[in-house]
Amino acid sequence: MRYRPVIGLEIHVQLSTKTKAFCSCPADVFELPPNTAICPVCTGQPGALPVPNEEMIRFAVKTALALNCKIHKYSRFDRKNYFYPDLPKGYQISQYFYPIATEGFLEIDGDEGRKKVRIRRLHLEEDAGKLVHEGDSITRASYSLVDMNRCGVPLIEIVTEPDISSPREARVFMEKLRSIVRYLGVSTGDMEKGALRCDANISVVDTETGRQSNRVEVKNMNSFRFVERALEYEFERIVKAMERGEDVERETRGWDMATKITVSMRGKEEESDYRYFPEPDIPPVVLSDEYLEEVKKELPELPDEKAERFMREYGLPEYDAKVLTSSKELAEFFEECVKVVNRPKDLSNWIMTEVLRELNERNIEITESKLTPQHFADLFKLMDEGKISIKIAKEIFPEVFETGKMPSQIVEEKGLTQINDEKLIEELVKKAMEQNPKAVQDYKSGKKKAAGFFVGYVMRETKGKANPELTNRIIQKLLEGE
């Protein structure tokens, strides 16, 4: 490929602390009425002094450890100065000169196999407020309203090195990061609600000439799919400009969900534009060795570790293990199921197909469903005892999922119990053979697929209730015995 994208990400993770970064207002403000979770501190009133949230610092250290970062025992807050309607203080409290962590990495499944994406820095900062645009888009709004509820909500910003080589890798990185912060319990990682936000910096290299375009920042990508789509669009836009011999402007562009294009928002700021200086009202953050050890002991088993254990302990293929451990709740559900039905691979197949299909259709987590390990115990028992076929099991599963009824109850209510009467099935096969001598002759002349005709006949006559394994056995016996 002649043109190669070079991508780095700047990710904001909203922390699930009880209170905001520097005041006692609630941090979970998503569903609150506008401007109801504010105080003099988070709205920057004269004389109000910030007090750092210890839980925010602990969550940042946990995340940094999970991302293999170097933790700095000394870090400091700074003021990032800029004007925007949703920033009442006129500055944002952040960490610029001395971040809490640097030099980490996250391993992902890249386009050419396993790869490390280096993390340049991880630092703490407070969120700004939120502009609500009439018309739901800044480019089409006739006016905007300001909601200050989000001011002061604690964030960690994670900045990667430009190690990402495709839009797909950017999406994979984001998905992996969300999985980690959810495992840690430091954030919901919900992009639709703004708990995980991603800005991407993309440039393009012409591998034939070595020429590299200017860097463009892309914002407003509020789902994993949009991260990939926006970067695909921007890559194509930059390539077309390079092919025309045009210079690519260094700017910030926003993804427009309606038109599926990026639109220019403003020129790209330089770091000097923000006039950073130390925050005089907050003392430095000093972490002891004892504190770091204490936090390290709180780390749970993370997705990669859990996937390796699933392969080792349950004999699962790597693909299964990664899918099951991508969600902490799904992994826990699988292990609970294994306790009552000790058939890991069969359970894995069901969870990765039938369960995930139902969850994705409803856009819910496994913990929000009515499904329990006992449902699988009952379902597998029905199949093992020959009372239902796997076909019937899959047909009733959506109702099991939706209603929470036991499979055996649904089977009984609908009269779906499998027919295992050998004499009845044999009579039906003989009848089919008498009525269709050509199919019999085809089978005997080597066209083994002709047996499918007799299977279909039996299933039609029994409304799909005949035991398929028993039916096939009887058909083979009668056809080869003639």
UniProtKB/Swiss-Prot annotation:
GO MF, one annotated term: asparaginyl-tRNA synthase (glutamine-hydrolyzing) activity
Pfam families: GatB_N, GatB_Yqey
GO biological process: glutaminyl-tRNAGln biosynthesis via transamidation; translation
Alphabetic keyword roster: ATP-binding, Ligase, Nucleotide-binding, Protein biosynthesis
Keyword Magnesium: no
Highest taxon, organism lineage: Bacteria
Ribosomal protein is among the record's keywords: no
Reactions listed under catalytic activity: L-glutamyl-tRNA(Gln) + L-glutamine + ATP + H2O = L-glutaminyl-tRNA(Gln) + L-glutamate + ADP + phosphate + H(+); L-aspartyl-tRNA(Asn) + L-glutamine + ATP + H2O = L-asparaginyl-tRNA(Asn) + L-glutamate + ADP + phosphate + 2 H(+)
EC number: 6.3.5.-
InterPro entries the UniProt entry points to: Asn/Gln-tRNA_amidoTrfase_suB/E, Asn/Gln-tRNA_Trfase_suB/E_cat, Asn/Gln_amidotransferase, Asn/Gln_tRNA_amidoTrase-B-like, GatB, GatB_C_1, GatB_Yqey_C_2, Gln-tRNA_amidoTrfase_suB_CS
Subunit structure: Heterotrimer of A, B and C subunits.
Purpose: Allows the formation of correctly charged Asn-tRNA(Asn) or Gln-tRNA(Gln) through the transamidation of misacylated Asp-tRNA(Asn) or Glu-tRNA(Gln) in organisms which lack either or both of asparaginyl-tRNA or glutaminyl-tRNA synthetases. The reaction takes place in the presence of glutamine and ATP through an activated phospho-Asp-tRNA(Asn) or phospho-Glu-tRNA(Gln).
Database matches in NCBIfam families: gatB, PRK05477.1-2, PRK05477.1-4
Family recorded in the similarity comment: Belongs to the GatB/GatE family. GatB subfamily.
Protein's recorded name: Aspartyl/glutamyl-tRNA(Asn/Gln) amidotransferase subunit B
Name of the coding gene: gatB
